[in-house]
Amino acid sequence: INITPAIVEFLLTNENAVSILERYPFLEFTVNENYPGLNNGKDDPCLARMAIHFPLVLANFGAGASSLKPVYDGLFKRVILDKNFIHQRVSALSFEPFMRAILWQIAPHCQSVMVSGIDDHGILQRVLPFNFGAMQGTLWPAVPAERVTTLVQQ
């Protein structure tokens, strides 16, 4: 669930909302790299409190708007690498060592690293060796709800 500062403020000031949401431990709240105060990491009181109560996900990592501080501070359960970040680098000879360096820096500070932008088989082949926790992209188009069961059984 993508969250904004207004949603964070609501969640942190409404005990009823917190108690309801804590019943659903599978819910994760996503912030983008441009979230206000993100670069302050755990020194941002709202983000620090949110990370205590709920699993947080950092999306669009690599878009260029944030430092590694919030990741190093352990605020995020998951980090999702930015689609454009991947697309800009995937065809370069330096992609493999670059990705290994990024993962070496990020992976110890979260439970999983996800990659977005997997839009064709060529990109898929380039990222498979890195054992990402999950992949996202147009290689797997959206399906109607009634086809999900069939898709999973394939």
Task: Label each region the model flagged.
Residues 20-23, 50, 74:
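Short, conserved loop/helix-junction motifs that constitute active-site signature segments
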Residues 13-17, 42-45, 93-100:
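Charged helix-capping and loop-helix junction motifs
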Residues 1-24:
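Bacterial c-di-GMP phosphodiesterase EAL domain
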Residues 5-7, 26, 30-37, 55, ...:
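EAL-family c-di-GMP phosphodiesterase catalytic domain
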Residues 12-16, 27-28, 33-35, 46, ...:
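Metal-dependent enolase-superfamily TIM-barrel catalytic cores that perform enediolate-based chemistry
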Residues 17-20, 46-47, 68-70:
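Short, flexible, glycine/charge-rich loop motifs used to bind or transfer phosphoryl groups or to couple energy/partner
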